[in-house]
Amino acid sequence: MGHGKKVATFTSPHIGSINDRICINGQPIADADFIRLAEQVKEMEKTLLQTHDQLSFFELLTLIAFLYFRDQEVDLVLLEVGIGGLLDTTNVVTGELAVITSIGLDHQETLGDSLEAIAEQKAGIFKAGKKAVIAKLPSETRLVCQKKADSLAVDLYQAGQDFSMLNGDFSSSLANLSQLKIGLEGTYQQENAALALQTFLLFMREGKEAVDEQVVRQALEKTHWAGRLERIRPQIYLDGAHNLPALTRLVEFVKEKEQEGYRPQILFGALKRKDYQGMLSYLTENLPQVELKVTGFDYQGSLDETDVTGYHVIPSYREFISSFEERADTKDLLFITGSLYFISEVRSHILGHEQIN
């Protein structure tokens, strides 16, 4: 956006309102536009139903997003896959750049029960003759991506090999930038920033457009992502880690805070259909000194006290958060995590409570 582009984003799930999934230059789609396009899609669906099944919720939203972005004549669309890639609703477009940020065991019932199988699904977004950028991945998944790229004549750029960032210094054949500041907390965010920066530089090179280094620096420093290691209060972090790869990164950050002398504790809420036992075990094993509490939330299918044994169960996260804020001192930190749906609900509660008071 800093380079004058009209940038659209389609993400899921939403953290605030459903409009947040469909944005242009950071501004969510207006209610009037959403309703107008939803009515168009429902009319289209009437014809579709003669030969096909009813559209899913995600398919409806994807269509609304595509129509909105077309009407608004955007320059660039950042399109986040819903699940996997190969068979995902979003994979009907031919993107100039495909990006894989991580590969871990998640949605096994749909994507397969091995890292290699999931990598096959994720690499399904690679398009013949285009470009792809991947994070630093385990060797078995990296090889799957490389094989897929080779079969489609895709130019593949790999973190740690073709580009990297260490201590704020970005290195790539496209550019070298030093002393960059990242707005998002957590050392691991440098890896995410490197991935985003490499993708941006490739996009700009493809369009033969000049890069303003100062704009890049300002953009990285101002980056904010709701529900992703978000410091919503001075002593409360929200992080939508909902699988083991994401949880690994959160644990890294919690350990950093422990080393700085803070006393972190974790409030965990998840969906029953997720591998919550594996996530809880991972937290217990890797953060043995950190208080871990489990709670339910209003979303259908969330954990409750009958699903977990051996953990401190909190009946009401609302009362717990209120109590924490009343008694916490400057070295106490609360990390709320386990599910993006949980984070969305907690975030609305905290911000809504602030508005009321």
Where do the PLM segments sit?
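ATP-dependent carboxylate-amine ligase catalytic core
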Residues: 2-93
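Beta-strand->loop->alpha-helix junctions that form or flank phosphate-binding loops
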Residues: 10-13, 135-136, 148-166, 183-186, ...
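Active-site-proximal loop->helix
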Residues: 13, 17-40, 109-126, 146-147, ...
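Acidic, Mg2+-coordinating active-site environments of NTP-dependent enzymes
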Residues: 48-49, 72-76, 80, 95-180, ...
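Short, high-confidence coil segments that cap the C-terminus of an alpha-helix
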Residues: 73-75, 261, 329-331
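Nucleotide phosphate-binding/pyrophosphate-handling subdomain across enzymes
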Residues: 76-79, 89-99, 103-107, 117, ...
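C-terminal helical cap/extension that packs against the catalytic core
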Residues: 138-156, 166-168, 274-335
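Active-site-proximal loop/hinge segments that shape catalytic or ion-binding/gating pockets
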Residues: 339
